[in-house]
Swiss-Prot record:
Pfam name, any one: FAE1_CUT1_RppA
GO cellular component entries: endoplasmic reticulum; endoplasmic reticulum membrane; mitochondrion
Domain FAE: 81-370
Annotated source species: Arabidopsis thaliana (Mouse-ear cress)
Family, per entry: Belongs to the thiolase-like superfamily. Chalcone/stilbene synthases family.
Spans traversing the lipid bilayer: 25-45, 64-84
Pathway: Lipid metabolism; fatty acid biosynthesis
Gene: CUT1
Domain of life: Eukaryota
Protein name per Swiss-Prot or TrEMBL: 3-ketoacyl-CoA synthase 6
UniProt note: phenotype after gene disruption: Plants have no wax crystals and are male sterile.
Entry's localization field: Endoplasmic reticulum membrane
InterPro entries: 3-ktacl-CoA_syn, ACP_syn_III_C, FAE1_typ3_polyketide_synth, Thiolase-like
Membrane topology listed for this record: Multi-pass membrane protein
Regulation acting on activity, per entry: Strongly inhibited by metazachlor and mefluidide.
Length: 497
């Protein structure tokens, strides 16, 4: 199914998104204003010396009213500053689920199952083969046990078993890494788009680990592949108002109940791309975690295009003519993703780009709007703002188009391509497999900036910016531990099956 290419980033940027980005800066204007003033005063006091300061003090004449007014003013300004200053949000550590080898689905196995399940639909089998050949996936991606049966057995029990397997293993590893005890978890957020049982997945986690009765728990569903960053945004907001707290985020997609067994081509695409995976993330606002945390959250920008009908329906769960439920992916998906991306990065640009890049971009944008629409648009160099890029591994076409539009090198998108090859599209958890890849390659240094970009149904585009808090040693375990030496690998345009 041919898809419209993603439009060039700066061909139709709207000024309202630029304005939105600068509104973020204005909201923190007081902090930006007071910090240099305080620094100048401190430097001047250090320059004067104690005797000169004492002489100045003695030369001043104060009365009680002046002292009270001055004290009140200082206290008022200090209070306003510290109340308006947001808490620092840390990413202490995270863990990614590593599927067992028994769940692997080589191309030959996938196609054999497709031929048996769709034995009366040879054209649908051929279509899946063409998609798989060009998907960018490798031979080691995994599907849950229920999908290995012929025919598949997508029962509620099987779906719960998959959820328990991926979520509990990721959380067990996270607790082991961080030393965090279940009783110390204050906030729990679980996001899974297509599987929403009763009791919820968050309740399942609470029951398993016997978490506190006053825990603040949330279960997000139906929010697509970008739900992981929505969970980060929710955790950030909660940590801003609840001091000295620990938050756990679980991002996953349960494949078992969502494996499409019908014949509609647009609904067969997810079968070829989506694979099992999960990630558990520990976030905190405790000052005691500042020394051991891996990252600090700098910015998070969310863009929702749901008001537009095409955007709303481009990723849509529905029944086909035979009653089989599946996800319909529109041929306009790439174009819609491009529009969401433009809005998102135009908003985040003023927050992260150097002043020189902002000036060039704004000059180009205003010139095109006022003087000549045919002027060649200036594409900001986001490589000056970030050292690492984690682009949602939704498919080969998504990565190709973002690399082209953002003018990124092969190394910048390496983590995304290799994650797609090794694990497939693991939905909302893919960003964390990509971050783990960068760490496993030993590339993460203190001060490095990471840009995570995710797309999701609705249609949404979300961005998170992290700053590395300390140089990260190459991990000895994790999802890449047994294969990182083989990567990066060459991925041909077409793999003949």
């Amino acid at each position: 199914m041919p898809q419209a290419p993603m439009p060039e980033f700066s061909s139709s940027v709207k000024l309202k998104y630029v304005k939105l980005g600068y509104q973020y800066l204005v909201n923190h204007f007081l902090s930006f204003l007071l910090i240099p003033i305080m620094a100048i005063v401190a430097v001047e006091l250090l320059r004067m010396g104690p005797e000169e300061i004492l002489n100045v003090w003695n030369s001043l004449q104060f009365d009680l009213v002046q002292v009270l007014c001055s004290s009140f003013f200082v206290i008022f300004i200090s209070t306003v500053y510290f109340m308006s200053k947001p808490r620092t949000i840390y990413l202490v550590d995270y863990s990614c689920y590593k599927p067992p080898v028994t769940c692997r689905v080589p191309f030959a196995t996938f196609m054999e199952h497709s031929r048996l399940i769709l034995k009366d639909k040879p054209k649908s089998v051929e279509f899946q083969m063409r998609i798989l050949e060009r998907s960018g996936l490798g031979e080691e991606t995994c599907l849950p046990p229920a999908i290995h049966y012929i025919p598949p057995t997508p029962t509620m029990d099987a779906a719960r078993s998959e959820a328990q397997m991926v979520i509990f293993e990721a959380m067990d590893d996270l607790f082991k890494k961080t030393g965090l005890k279940p009783k110390d978890v204050d906030i729990l957020i679980v996001n899974c788009s297509l599987f929403s049982p009763t009791p919820s997945l968050s309740a399942m986690v609470i029951n398993k680990y016997k978490l506190r009765s006053n825990i603040k728990s949330f279960n997000l569903s139906g929010m697509g592949c970008s739900a992981g960053l929505i969970s980060v945004d929710l955790a950030r907001d909660l940590l801003q108002v609840h001091p000295n707290s620990n938050a756990i985020i679980v991002s996953t997609e349960i494949i078992t109940p969502n494996y499409y067994q019908g014949n509609e081509r647009a609904m067969l695409l997810p079968n070829c791309l989506f694979r099992m995976g999960a990630a558990a993330i520990h976030m905190s606002n405790r000052r005691s975690d500042r020394w051991r945390a891996k990252y600090k959250l700098s910015h998070l920008v969310r863009t929702h295009r749901g008001a537009d009908d095409k955007s709303f329906y481009c990723v849509y769960e529905q029944e086909d003519k035979e009653g089989h439920v599946g996800i319909n992916l529109s041929k306009d998906l790439m174009a819609i993703a491009g529009e969401a991306l433009k809005a998102n990065i135009t908003t985040i640009g003023p927050l992260v780009l150097p002043a020189s890049e902002q000036l060039l971009f704004l000059t180009s944008l205003i010139g095109r709007k006022i003087f000549n629409p045919k002027w060649k648009p200036y594409i900001p160099d986001f490589k000056l703002a970030f050292e690492h890029f984690c682009i949602h591994a939704g498919g080969r076409a998504v990565i190709d188009e973002l690399q082209k539009n953002l003018q990124l090198s092969g190394e910048h998108v390496e983590a995304s391509r290799m994650t797609l090859h090794r694990f497939g599209n693991t939905s909302s958890s893919s960003l964390w497999y990509e971050l783990s890849y960068i760490e496993s390659k030993g590339r993460m240094r203190r001060g490095d900036r990471v840009w995570q970009i995710a797309f999701g149904s609705g249609f949404k585009c979300n961005s998170a910016v992290w700053k590395c808090n300390r140089t990260i040693k190459t991990p000895k375990d994790g999802p890449w531990s047994d294969c990182i030496d083989r990567y990066p690998v060459f991925i041909p345009e077409v793999v003949k099956l």
